[in-house]
């Protein structure tokens, strides 16, 4: 015991001996390392897979600032967090796209209904125009029919009757005592002439002709 203490004091008191011991501790020989238990007690470290993380900024960050034995766990947790963020963002994006798709479908349905109604109106207008065109073509192709003999006789009789009745009315208004003064062949001729000029339709002209002729007869 005393000898050990003396040897310890001798080692501490000798600077050269301390330097030699320090060198052995820093760079021990295999035998010294086995004796000292350095290799047996060395802390195990977790190595990153070869090639993994090459060019990856996340793993480059971990390699630089995180202890090697905790890099794998940190990398795993960080990637899980990134996946959660992506999934959350994906859910929001999916919901937004579904809402936009529903709105677009509703707008498209409304546009299609409006287009169908517009097409229906357009077809109705086109059908009306085609009908009018066909009617105009049909009417334009018809030739005017002339009056037959019976119609001519009837028109003449009606025209003369109107003119003759008008002449009698004038006679009554003028209080002529003898209606025969205006009911002469000249009055009838005037009525027939007016009917000829008016193509059997102008009763106004017949009336004017008869009145003019009747007044002329009355002033004689």
Curated annotation (Swiss-Prot):
<keyword id="KW-0946">Virion</keyword>
<keyword id="KW-1035">Host cytoplasm</keyword>
<keyword id="KW-0597">Phosphoprotein</keyword>
<dbReference type="GO" id="GO:0030430">
    <property type="term" value="C:host cell cytoplasm"/>
</dbReference>
<keyword id="KW-0143">Chaperone</keyword>
<protein>
    <recommendedName>
        <fullName>Phosphoprotein</fullName>
    </recommendedName>
</protein>
<dbReference type="InterPro" id="IPR005010">
    <property type="entry name" value="Rhabdo_M1"/>
</dbReference>
<comment type="subunit">
    <text>Homotrimer when phosphorylated. This trimer is stabilized by binding to the L protein. Binds soluble protein N, and ribonucleocapsid.</text>
</comment>
<dbReference type="Pfam" id="PF03342">
    <property type="entry name" value="Rhabdo_M1"/>
</dbReference>
<keyword id="KW-0693">Viral RNA replication</keyword>
<dbReference type="GO" id="GO:0044423">
    <property type="term" value="C:virion component"/>
</dbReference>
<comment type="function">
    <text>Non catalytic polymerase cofactor and regulatory protein that plays a role in viral transcription and replication. Stabilizes the RNA polymerase L to the N-RNA template and binds the soluble protein N, preventing it from encapsidating non-genomic RNA.</text>
</comment>
């Amino acid at each position: 015991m005393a000898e050990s203490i003396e040897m310890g004091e001798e080692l501490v008191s000798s600077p050269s001996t301390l330097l030699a011991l320090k060198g052995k501790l820093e760079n021990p020989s295999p035998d010294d390392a086995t004796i000292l238990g350095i290799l047996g007690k060395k802390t195990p470290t977790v190595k990153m897979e070869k090639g993994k993380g090459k060019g990856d900024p996340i793993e480059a960050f971990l390699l630089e600032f995180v202890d090697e034995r905790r890099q794998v766990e940190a990398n795993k947790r960080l990637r899980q967090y990134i996946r959660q963020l992506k999934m959350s963002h994906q859910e929001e994006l999916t919901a937004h796209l579904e809402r936009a798709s529903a709105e677009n479908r509703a707008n498209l349905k409304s546009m299609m209904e409006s287009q169908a109604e517009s097409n229906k109106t357009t077809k109705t207008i086109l059908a009306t125009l085609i009908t009018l065109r066909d009617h105009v073509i049909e009417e334009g192709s018809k030739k005017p029919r002339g009056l037959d003999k019976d119609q001519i006789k009837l028109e003449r009789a009606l025209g003369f009757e109107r003119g003759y009745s008008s002449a009698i009315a004038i006679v009554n208004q003028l209080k002529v005592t003898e209606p025969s003064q205006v009911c002469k062949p000249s009055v009838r001729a005037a009525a027939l002439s007016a009917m000829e000029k008016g193509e059997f339709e102008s009763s106004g002209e017949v009336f004017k002709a008869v009145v003019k002729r009747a007044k002329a007869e009355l002033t004689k």
